[in-house]
Amino acid sequence: MYMIVCFDLEGPISPQDNAYELMKLIPNGGEIFSKISKYDDILALKKKDYEAGYTLALILPFLISHKINEDDIKRVSEKAKINEGVKELVSILKKKHKFYIISTSYEQHAYSIGKRIGVPKEDIYCTKFPINDYLHYDIDLQEAEKEILNLKDHNIEEFFNNFYEKIDKDIKKIIENTKVIGGKYKTEAIYKILERENENIKSVVAVGDSITDFKMLKAVKEKGGISIVFNGNEYAIPYAEFAFAGTNLLPLAYFIESKNKKEFIKKWNGEGYFHHVNKDIEKIILIHKKYRNIMRGKAGELG
């Protein structure tokens, strides 16, 4: 059976959170990123139409302020590890099927990783990010950065609401126009791919791991496709049909190619854990949390 395999990037393919690593080029940037990520989580919980993962747009003022450019993104991306077994998985699946990446990642990072594992640009759906076009803006955020470092959790929402409301109107427009490919936009990408391939959603295998993937996983599962969570968190696992926790992606290629998924799970005795996500979800979450921490460390805590 011909399948359209759609993988998230950060987590399943590479453990690096590229935006987090990029912010670490800025003094105290990792801490600032973590505060903004918490703000993003708050908005995702409180705002009905808000899409989680918007952190990638919200950090823009800080990247612009410190003149971070496309070469910086590429340089950070070059240091990103590729998860064990990914190249073999892509090679195996591309022999009979179509392989796509759907990622919140900035395009510079997504294309760099794609090149390293044999996925061309045209098969990657990601966040367009022409940051060099914004480097002529001069904004001083030193005082704001000091305040952010001292923020208590209960003050995060109020501070950032005011910060983004009062920010320079041109910068605000850039933030608003940055379309981060997470949430519903990942689902949109699935349908664009189906139109391009002239296939229906039952041919889709979607693989994700976090809050930005759950809508894609849910849509594919409900429409008869195959949805898989890899080293996922509590936001993604309940919406997938199957789950795999491990340190090597190669078994996932064999699972995807298997004709009887439930039988494969019963017989599996290799490294890692396969589950059919229909019961014991809390147990599955604990197993995945362990492997997520092994594989992603700090990045795995960021939504």
Q: Residue ranges of each PLM-predicted region?
A:
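Short, small/polar residue-rich loop motifs at catalytic or cofactor-binding pockets
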Residues: 1-2, 224
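Alpha-helical substrate-recognition element adjacent to the catalytic core
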Residues: 2-139, 243, 247
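C-terminal cap/substrate-recognition subdomain and adjoining C-terminal extension
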Residues: 84-88, 95, 105-303
